[in-house]
Regions:
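Conserved catalytic-core motifs of GNAT/GCN5-like acyltransferases
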Residues: 101-103, 113, 118-136
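Conserved GNAT acetyl-CoA-binding A-motif
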Residues: 93-106
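Short amphipathic alpha-helix that is part of the acyltransferase structural core
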Residues: 1-32, 123, 133-140
Length: 140
């Protein structure tokens, strides 16, 4: 592997972002919507193997004391090689002095627990598609 980390949105193929999200069974939108989300984020990380995008993630933050990590995804063929860990660690490092929260895809909680994230007892959410989030086990 010849991995390269990128910390901006320059020359990203947003269609590849969509395809990776589909392959890992995460929510996806059009490439333009993902471009807007990543461009407007506080911190972004993209990981490529040679010229092929293999993973990414982003954090939104007030830059003072709160941050939220979203859209951490790694191609299935690259999972288990430390790439997700690199993405999460880079996002946490880029939001110093911040509490960092996220919601994990069901079944992926242990991955984040290895990075010292802990389950919250009082987390609440207001989702646009509440039924889908309940069906996908994100909410009770």
């Amino acid at each position: 592997m010849n991995l390269r980390l990128q910390f901006d949105t320059t020359a990203i193929d947003w269609n590849q972002v969509v395809e990776i999200l589909k392959k890992v069974d995460m929510a996806y939108y059009t490439g333009e919507i993902h471009q807007m989300a990543f461009t407007n984020s506080h911190s972004v990380v993209f990981v490529s193997d040679d010229e092929n995008l293999v993973g990414f993630g982003r954090a939104i933050s007030d830059g003072a004391y709160q941050a939220v990590i979203y859209d951490v995804a790694v191609l299935p063929s690259y999972q288990g090689k430390g790439i997700g860990k690199m993405i999460v660690q880079a996002l946490v490092k880029n939001t110093p002095h911040c509490n960092v929260i996220l919601y994990a895809s069901p079944g992926k909680e242990a991955f984040y627990e290895k990075e010292n994230f802990r389950r919250m007892k009082t987390g609440m959410a207001l989702f646009l598609d509440a039924k889908r989030m309940q069906e996908n086990r994100f909410t009770e």
